[in-house]
């Protein structure tokens, strides 16, 4: 019986280890994220937007509070992804609602199989020439895990979910409430997203 018990022990050990590994990978360490407690509050700006970010292919740094009093759709993007075509719908969405206190914020990232250019000038050129992107785009950065930029760390902290791929979308109300993330599979011009945006305008 001893060999049988030992075999059962090994099976249980490896099963639990694999299960824990899968759980950890799905969790993406979101619970370990910490809000930026050192940030000076900006009057009238929701805390979720109070982050300094560098503009794409530029030395200019802005605070996302520049977009306070707007409904915000924050998206992690990439130029060489199977979902890159969603840029077209994102730009159309921006053009439709930008006059109604709505903005899209794009955050290029190489987190997922390095599907973004390493050179920000290439990212900018691609977005402009291929899709005519005019919504704000920011510096290439990490959007998941402990190396994520502070904005996406806080999105993960609030929602309990980091991006699991490119083109994950976070909708934020004018008062700073973050709605549940929309996955890459939900198109920007889907009725689900459009209805959610219109309910906040």
PLM features per residue range, with description:
Residues 4-10:
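Sec-dependent signal peptide recognition
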Residues 68-72, 98-103, 131-136, 166-167, ...:
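Loop/turn elements at helix/coil->beta-strand transitions in domains of secreted/extracellular proteins
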Residues 150-153, 157-201:
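Thiol-/selenol-based redox modules, centered on thioredoxin-like
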């Amino acid at each position: 019986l001893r060999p049988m018990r030992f075999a059962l022990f090994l099976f249980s050990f490896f099963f639990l280890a694999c299960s824990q590994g899968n759980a950890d990978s799905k969790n993406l360490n979101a619970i370990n994220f910490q809000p930026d407690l050192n940030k000076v509050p900006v009057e009238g700006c929701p805390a979720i937007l109070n982050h300094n970010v560098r503009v794409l292919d530029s030395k200019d740094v802005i605070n996302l509070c520049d977009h306070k009093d707007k409904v915000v759709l924050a998206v992690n993007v990439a130029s060489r992804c199977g979902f890159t075509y969603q840029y077209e719908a994102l730009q159309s969405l921006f053009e439709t609602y930008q006059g109604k206190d709505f903005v899209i914020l794009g955050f290029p990232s190489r987190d997922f199989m390095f599907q973004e250019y390493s050179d920000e000038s290439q990212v900018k050129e691609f977005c402009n020439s291929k899709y005519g992107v005019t919504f704000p785009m920011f510096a290439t950065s990490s959007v998941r895990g402990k190396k994520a930029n502070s904005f996406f760390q806080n999105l993960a902290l609030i929602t309990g979910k980091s991006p699991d791929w490119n083109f994950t979308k976070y909708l934020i109300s004018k008062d700073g409430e973050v709605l549940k993330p929309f996955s890459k599979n939900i198109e920007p011009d889907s009725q689900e997203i459009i209805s959610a945006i219109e309910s906040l305008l």
